[in-house]
């Protein structure tokens, strides 16, 4: 038992702060290595433009693929053994893998370790499940929206810090620095997260069919999983072509990398500002209204992105898009809280993470395929169509639902 654990009531606000810090640290740790991932692949012996592109894409995607496979297993274990234990497992496991990545000698070793990183991940969905089971239901939107800003903040700062560290110390040391960040996350979680959890035996655990029958509205929950997948597909579809699109808009300028970095970052900044506020508004008017409104707003912003003429115009539209995006996943998570019990929260959030990871893999593939055949601008129009479908699909799934009265 950690020093922070005793018989006093759990302070969910303190747990939220600590979980936010954990999500920030893991978000930063994951993104620290992203700016130089292709360079590290090259350092491990991969040569040639096409081979380098192929291997960079594979080592990037395989983490999400294996995370999608492993998430339901870890979610079930969280419902049996507790969410805090899963947070500790994830932080420590990823820290050890990062050390091994820094010691990798060839591309195959690195590929296996990237897959292992996906298998051992799961800090964020378990943090969501922990907070969702402790926070008063009428504050779920605000709490989950606030928690989401932790990972976003880390993901924003990570690439910049990773690039600076790689330039200063070389590529391999960054993996060791990343590992130390994850070990710090482990100790922060160990000593400052509190959870009162009664372990459940394997025989007492609900099986998959019982999980489905225990849901208030299983079809609605499945539709929320699909919504999460489509949100990530839409977000990821733009990632492969953003820098090239900015270069096309900017023309002959020397600082296209800096401009691209700024335009890539502004949605995250906007999401930081909007997520807690829109989450709080969702607690008042209903998260389903926030979800549908944000999806429609996203469609109205994606269409003009296809017609912009300058990087500034694109940057402004992406900032506004980020404000809408900041509301989407927290709204989905809040609806999942409303429609499932604490007993199965770990599995529900892990299933949702699996759909999110599948979206993370398929989104960039879709964007790259569309741009290769129809050009950069077509990506935004197709993505707008995908999001519009998501809005109609979500509205149809949610229209008969009435928000239950929630109280402290």
Swiss-Prot record:
PROSITE patterns: MFS. The chain crosses the membrane at residues 16-36, 58-78, 92-112, 115-135, 146-166, 173-193, 224-244, 256-276, 290-310, 378-398. One of its GO terms (biological process) is response to antibiotic. Pfam families: MFS_1 (PF07690). It is found in: Cell inner membrane. InterPro entries: MFS, MFS_dom, MFS_MdtG_subfamily, MFS_trans_sf, Mutidrug-R_MdtG, Tet-R_TetA/multi-R_MdtG-like. Keywords: Antibiotic resistance, Cell inner membrane, Cell membrane, Membrane, Transmembrane, Transmembrane helix, Transport. GO terms for cellular component: plasma membrane. Confers resistance to fosfomycin and deoxycholate. Belongs to the major facilitator superfamily. DHA1 family. MdtG (TC 2.A.1.2.20) subfamily. NCBIfam families: PRK09874.1. This is Multidrug resistance protein MdtG. It comes from Escherichia coli O17:K52:H18 (strain UMN026 / ExPEC). The gene is mdtG.
